[in-house]
Amino acid sequence: DVCSTDLWFQEAVDAGRGSKQRERFWFRDGQGVNGELPPNNWKAVFGGGAWSRITEPDGTPGQWFLHTFTPWQPDFNWLNEDVVDYFDRMLRFWFDRGVDGFRVDAVTVVGKHPDLPDAPAVASAVAETDAWAFNPYTVFWPSAHDAWRHWREVVNQYEIDHPGRELVTVSEAYTPGKPDLLLRYVEPDQFHQSFTFDLLLSPWNALSFHKAAARSYQALHNAGATLTWALNNHDAHRVVTRYGRADAHLMSSWTGSNLVNSDAPVDLELGHRRARAAALLVLGLPGAAYLYMGEELGLPEVLDIPDSARQDPIFARTEGREKGRDGCRVPMPWTNSSERLAGFSTSANVESWMPQPEDWGSRSVESQDDDCSSMLALYRQALSCRVDMVKQGEEIHFIGDGTDGLFSFTRGSYAVVVNTSEDAVEIPQEIMAGRGLILGSQTGVFSTGEEASYIAANSAVWLG
């Protein structure tokens, strides 16, 4: 999609029906006696209908345009050659300026059935902002893959024309529990990587972690594709907050809009402890690990943003029924001082698009920089150790199925063990096998004796 103030869209509005400018988007006549009804029943991601009506140049009510997200984001028609050429030039423009890759958002809704038929009715229990996901005429529509194949041709040709450049594209395709569907996006002629969100969408329990990791690993590793993990992103409450809730271990707390709308009480100390363990989990897995800004600081979700300061269109489109995702998008703190947005800006007189909490500076990079027990220190240690772990190869072996509260796997000479239970658990001998502690999620989480070794509750260890 593109901004509704973009020159191309403004030209399309001015050009009138049947113009080549309108063919770059999805303009259609409305239904009803005077075209007063939208062309079909499609729903927008952020609530409401997916169509908005324009006023024609002569001042009369006119055609409707399609917007999968908001009226300020009209959808491009990716079947249009002008659009294809525009993005070819855009990719090369940024590659010429040293950009090495692109993260491509919302790839699952780029394709459209050319006839734009009505979507099937959805169950009444489906949330207003989830109805769009059940539209088979845009979600995972096959024509989108033609666009990504073309992008890959552009990327490959650029590398040929510029020896030494290594470029990467990664897609954001929400396909939880459907690794075979995810594989479509990482075929050799499409994206280099595609986010695996199964861990992000898993509750805090070893059984769920095992199912999510094993399912993704078996599908992508066997296909020769790169596993691409994430625990946080811009669309979900931060993991420190999610893991700090009393129902964090339940799948029901992790489904649908609960990822962004839960207002259950949060135990931040518990959330931090679990988030530290989860960091070792995801950084121990083979493949690529993506860290969301502030994750390495252990930032919690900001839950008390005033309604007047909220920016997420979900909040406005649902008339405040859903708070949206603003709380994970608050500017990251770099310094202890509240000046210059805790170091986020170099300007002395700047207003943030989202207010920072008063204690944000105490969670900053500066406040954690020299603290060997901080979340930042843990990430630095883990990333340093990960360099050697990567040399062990991509093959891992899962130990158990998580029903004992342990999510465990071996990777070469390393072993990763995560205890999601509320009690210390004995580490099986097949995991220990002469190994010792390399790194713990915090001090004191690993103990060993003559006959047994234990991992503390809500903790993780790397052994080797």
Predicted regions and their residues:
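Active-site and adjacent substrate-binding regions of carbohydrate-active enzymes
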Residues: 1-435, 439-464
